[in-house]
Amino acid sequence: MAPIKKRNQQNQPNINERIRFPKIRVVDADGTQLGIMAPSEAMEIADERNLDLVLVSDKADPPVCRVMDYGKFKFEQEKKAREAKKKQHTSDVKEVKMRYKIQTHDYEVRVNHAKRFLKSGDKVKATVTFRGREIQHSHLAEALLKKMANDLLDFAEIQQAPKREGRNMIMYLSPKK
């Protein structure tokens, strides 16, 4: 039979009876200082008010504890974490592919796609693909990518200049700050 694992005490916050310090500084829910006292006295104050005693900072001397409703405090922290996660935007790399013999309208469509990606905060990888002997005309592809960078000057800055990788020529653009 496998041994029963105890719940890890480190993951649980120091509240009420779990506070193990000889003296603590106690702060009220509204921020007023109640003074330095033993944890048992602070627990009595918290019990009178039907609140919890929560360890705020164990680095201070003496450690700081606050009398508050722990359930409400935990809910507020989780809510703040959710809001921060919503606002966080991961920057993806979006690719715009074309050939060096691209027509004007098709080129404009690619530029508009790149603009849209850059406005949404994503990086853009502009790729010009070669087929067969087209690779001999890599200077035309480089000129096309430089033209694209010039057209997107208001929205982007070149992160990596046009460079050949195998049968492709690639340029990276990142949104302007």
Curated annotation (Swiss-Prot):
The UniProt record lists the keyword Protein biosynthesis: yes
Intracellular or extracellular location(s): Cytoplasm
Signal peptide extent: none
GO biological process: ribosome disassembly
Keyword Cytoplasm on entry: yes
Keywords: Cytoplasm, Initiation factor, Protein biosynthesis
Any one annotated GO CC term: membrane
Family membership noted in the UniProt record: Belongs to the IF-3 family.
Designated name of the protein: Translation initiation factor IF-3
